[in-house]
Amino acid sequence: MSTKQKKTIQKGSFKRLLKLFFFKNKMLTALMLFSIIISAVATALGPQYLGYATDSIVQDMSNPVSSNIHWDRFFFWAWISSVIFLIQFVSKWLSAWFSTRIISDTAKELRSQVETKLWSLPLNYFDTNSHGDIMSRTTNDIDNVVTTLNSSGADTIYSIFQLVGMIVMMTAINWRLALITVIIIPVSGWIVTLISRFVRKEYQKQWYYTGMINSNVEESVNGHNIVKLYGQEEKFVEAFRKQNRLLYESSFKAMAVSNLIQPLSRFFTNLNYVIVALGGALRVISGQMTVGDVQAFIQYTRQFQTPFSKLSQAYSSLQSGIASLDRIYELLDSEDQAEEKPEARASYRLQGKIDFRDVSFSYVPERKLIEHMNLVVEPGQMVAIVGGTGAGKTTLVNLIERFYEVNIGEIIFDDKVEIHDLTRACLRENIAMVLQDTWVYKGTIGDNLKYGLKREITEEEFRNACRETFVDQFVSTLPDGYQTVISNEMSSLSAGEKQLLTICRAFLVKPNILILDEATSSVDTRTEAMIDQALDKLREGRTSFVIAHRLSTIRNADVILVMENGHIVEQGSHKELLAQNGAYAGLYQAQFES
């Protein structure tokens, strides 16, 4: 990505955040801005009225005729100043409250947008992006944006108004001294901008490497058994060290250089303070200013450091926030899955016949995975798909579920319904899957079994399904039975028991189309037999596609498809394909001999 494109993204991201921040709740925003303006005006007026109080004392003390001090005038100006500072306190607190509410709403909206976006992304987004990086964008980056808004939100706006108010008041007191102060600001700001450009690049690297570390940790946690089995701990540790070192370097550079900004701003502010103190003293001697004016001006100069430093600090913090914001909007701007046809049916019961007509598909244009495939599957048929890695087995079933869209050709159901004539939700209500990688969510076994059900079922129907799929056999031995809490990360269930759960889940859905990824290699013989029986019951009367890894399990398939490089090279029953003595016979013989 070019530098120009990056700048465009950064500006666009920041504008979108401002729009979200200011216009999500216009009433709260208006109240916040009103409170900030009142607070800034009160802050600007306070020193001036204290100067009036000082002048009243100095004038009385220097009066050659009478040395009486008019305390009533002094206390009047002091009382006015106190009221102003009280107003400043209340309005500042209100602005902070409104700001916190707006930031919370903004964070909530950002998280909602990201969550909604994740469900609208096509499957290839998750196939081509690391899951750790996606998690980092949805958690770490949003948290960082919220932190940036908290540190650079209302305070930044307040500091701007405060600076403007102080400049106006200083100009009213003495425009020459005010000009010196105003000249120093752009010089300091220009230097801060130069530093911040470097800081932003390092913050972008920092959040990128944070995503990489998350991916590394996710892989090591999910596959820790395999890593230990093959003695690859050192490899993971070394990869983590490398990424951690890169994260350290980018973070250190960003923070080290960023830490220059505030001291540098203070240096220019203190330099301005010295010039004002000397210039003011000379003007008091010459009678051009009163002592109260100098006191007020010096107080403005000293207070000038606070908003100026806050603005400098906010600008530095903003670089980290914008870097995270770019990553969030990069996710939000990713291309969605293809839109549904306006007339697509939201409810339809498929009978199970599927007709692939001249279907072609590729993830990338230069590499075709499926080319001009023609296939007719009758209702209730069991179709087994065999072939080597990359042959197109999984791609074929992904096309049936519309996880991917065909590039060319059509998929027709029941001789009359084209796949795009149904909404994705409607299509998938007719399909159930039993995958090689079983998945359960945190909840009770009962809730997991009913996951995805769109209809009410009776307790008797539920228990019958559990008995038919042998789930009741092991759940009944658990102390809490179907109320036992399980999760994907922590569970007392074996791999085979989890597979039986997913089979029962599919059984309860009562689909007319099944997709089965053969997954019995990691279980014992007894459990494998139960899984096979449960699958046989599940397949009864349903069209099923079985991604087969062991050819001995698909002898009874109605149709066996042998795929190579996206093409169906052989098609027929087990006996027919063996008789042809082709690719299938070679695969079968190889497995039999092994």
Model-derived features: positions:
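ABC-type nucleotide-binding domain
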Residues: S347-S594
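Transmembrane helices of ABC transporter permease
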Residues: K24, L28-V41, I84-I87, S151-Q206, ...
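Membrane-integrated ABC transporters
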Residues: M1-G46, V58-I80, S95-S99, I103, ...
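Helix-loop-helix
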Residues: D60-M61, M169-I183, K253-D326, L332
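An intracellular "coupling" helix at the cytosolic face of ABC transporter transmembrane type-1 domains
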Residues: K19, F23-K26, L123-N124, N140-L149, ...
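Short intracellular "coupling" helices and adjacent cytoplasmic loop segments at the cytosolic face
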Residues: S2-K7, S104, S112-S136, N140-I142, ...
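Hydrophobic/aromatic residues in alpha-helical transmembrane segments
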Residues: G46, L50, S95, S99, ...
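Alpha-helical segments in transporter systems
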Residues: M27-Y52, W77, S81, A96-T100, ...
